[in-house]
Amino acid sequence: QKELGKDKQMAKDAEPTFVGIRSDNELVAVNSCYYSNSKGIFNYWRSRGMWVHPNFRGQKYSSVILTWCLEYAKRKDGDWMWTVPRESALPAYKSVGFVQQSDWFEDGQYGPNCIASKYL
């Protein structure tokens, strides 16, 4: 059984939808979301790649993008959304209802990370 956040092939096979916010024609925030897998009766979606330009952080751009991704996944029959945020990004995810589901771990150059999820 593959665990959320540990299946590298899942991300390679994904067909993500990207969403961004522009200010004065400059991309200032971006994220992606995609269907990742089903387990039992639940369809899981992943949020991946949240980025907000440093000059625009702290202005709720991440909340707007995450809310859009959550609503999009729900319209596509998603039941849960999960993510592997770095420590500095977890507050943005919590602001829209994600709950930390794991301890912190090092997984590459952007850690520490954890697994967080939200029921749609």
Question: Whereabouts are the PLM-identified features?
Answer:
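Short amphipathic alpha-helix that is part of the acyltransferase structural core
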Residues: 1-28
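Conserved beta-strand in the GNAT
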Residues: 20, 26-36, 44-51
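A conserved beta-turn-beta hairpin within the catalytic core of GNAT-like acetyltransferases
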Residues: 36-48, 57, 110-112
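Conserved acetyl-CoA pyrophosphate-binding loop and the N-cap/start of the following alpha-helix
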Residues: 56-68
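Conserved GNAT acetyl-CoA-binding A-motif
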Residues: 73-86
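Conserved catalytic-core motifs of GNAT/GCN5-like acyltransferases
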Residues: 84, 99-117
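Short alpha-helical
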Residues: 87-91
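Conserved active-site tyrosine of GNAT-family acetyltransferases
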Residues: 93-94, 98
